[in-house]
């Protein structure tokens, strides 16, 4: 007997699906591959949890983020069975699964959603191959890692091995928050997707106030940061040292601040993240270690102390601002010429020539963005991801620093990108 969709949605605490969610779920149910460029806070998890509930077959979600796995396990434990696998163990409700439970999953008697790191997925080839007829979907989160300079790239590019594992491969859903058309095409080719359905939501948003300012010295920067702080705030920094320096300076001015970077112990990072989530810390100075998988909806301000490494990273990071309904967000980049020196140092550490060239191209995009003082910033973002650098449609967000200057230099856009 078919269960009405509204019954599943009620279990998930939803009244209806977004148009794009409905299109993705329908495509999964029809056995189609999908690529989704979906912004932070869109509700990607619904797109693979719901097919699992409807089909009552196992869904595998590949993600590099252990924190995301644990968050999803807490969030959906009352509506489906969530298994996490980021080591040699497989856990159910924070306990290692028994031999009988693992056998039931393998035999299809215990359909579940299995969260796995890409490395763990690749190491379980024989087990996953044996489950073929019980798997309804393989979802690959943060799929832009296939083309990006990150610690996850090698394991992500190896995921195409799965195409040889199955007689009839389950549909693949590859999703990310931001990606250019070049990246999307690369993902589709590497994963060997078959005529994928492409779902794309524009990165432009009308509730973000974007601005760029030049930083002269530390004292000047702290003054600007203090002026920009509104509500819950993240200050993204390029180095671990800067996170501590900025946090200490803001504490001196009476802010309840903290810092977060990969050099801290897991226990300390979890503690800081929890305090920030609960509002016990007003301002968090952080490196990009406080990044993918962070699910905090009431962040009001994102400040970059130094330019991000590329436009993709920048849009992922500002996408964490103003995610609640009717909320207005403030996003500001503080930059200096020295930031490009730091980016070039990181660039030289990339051994892969092709990847190094791609990263250099992406860095050029953010460099043009921060140096521009004429054209609508939201338009620059839109055109970067669409690859339409020569557009002359006169789009203006009327909410960024360039638009607020009430100047129109549309005809200069082509020369800016040459």
Give the role of each language-model region:
Residues 2-3, 360:
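Amphipathic alpha-helical repeat elements characteristic of tetratricopeptide repeat
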Residues 67:
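Conserved Rossmann-like nucleotide-cofactor binding loop
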């Amino acid at each position: 007997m078919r269960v009405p969709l509204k019954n599943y949605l009620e279990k998930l605490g939803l009244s209806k699906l977004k148009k794009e969610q409905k299109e993705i779920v329908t495509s999964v149910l029809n056995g189609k591959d999908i690529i989704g460029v979906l912004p932070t806070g869109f509700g990607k998890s619904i797109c693979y949890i719901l097919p699992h509930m409807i089909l009552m077959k196992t869904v595998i979600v590949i993600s590099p983020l252990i924190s995301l796995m644990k968050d999803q396990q807490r969030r959906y434990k009352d509506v489906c069975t969530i298994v996490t696998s980021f080591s040699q163990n497989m856990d159910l409700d924070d306990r290692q699964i028994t031999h009988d439970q693992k056998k039931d999953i393998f035999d299809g008697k215990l359909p579940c959603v299995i969260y796995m790191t890409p490395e763990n997925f690749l190491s379980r080839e024989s087990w996953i191959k044996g489950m073929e007829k019980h798997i309804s979907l393989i979802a690959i989160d943060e799929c832009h890692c296939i083309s990006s300079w990150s610690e996850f790239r090698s394991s992500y590019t190896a995921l195409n091995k799965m195409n040889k594992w199955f007689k009839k491969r389950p549909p693949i859903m590859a999703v990310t928050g931001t990606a250019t058309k070049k990246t999307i095409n690369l993902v589709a080719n590497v994963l060997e997707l078959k005529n994928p359905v492409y779902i794309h939501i524009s990165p432009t948003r009308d509730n973000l106030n974007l601005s760029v300012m030049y930083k002269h010295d530390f004292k000047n920067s702290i003054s600007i940061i203090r002026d920009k702080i509104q509500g819950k705030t993240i200050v993204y920094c390029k180095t671990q040292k800067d996170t501590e320096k900025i946090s200490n300076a803001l504490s001196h001015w009476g802010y309840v601040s903290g810092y977060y970077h990969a050099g801290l112990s897991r226990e300390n990072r979890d503690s800081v993240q929890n305090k920030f989530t609960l509002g016990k810390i007003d301002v968090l100075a952080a490196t990009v270690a406080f990044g993918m998988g962070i699910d905090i909806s009431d962040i009001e301000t994102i400040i970059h102390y130094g330019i991000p490494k590329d436009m993709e990273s920048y849009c992922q990071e500002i996408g964490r601002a103003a995610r609640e309904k009717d909320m207005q967000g403030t996003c500001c980049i503080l930059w200096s010429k020295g930031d490009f020196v730091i980016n070039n140092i990181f660039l030289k550490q990339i051994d892969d020539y092709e990847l190094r060239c791609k990263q250099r191209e992406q860095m050029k995009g953010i460099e043009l963005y921060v140096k521009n003082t004429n054209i609508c910033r939201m338009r620059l973002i839109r055109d970067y991801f669409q690859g339409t650098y020569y557009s002359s449609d006169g789009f203006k967000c009327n909410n960024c620093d360039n638009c607020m200057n009430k100047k129109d230099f549309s005809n200069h856009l082509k020369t800016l990108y040459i």
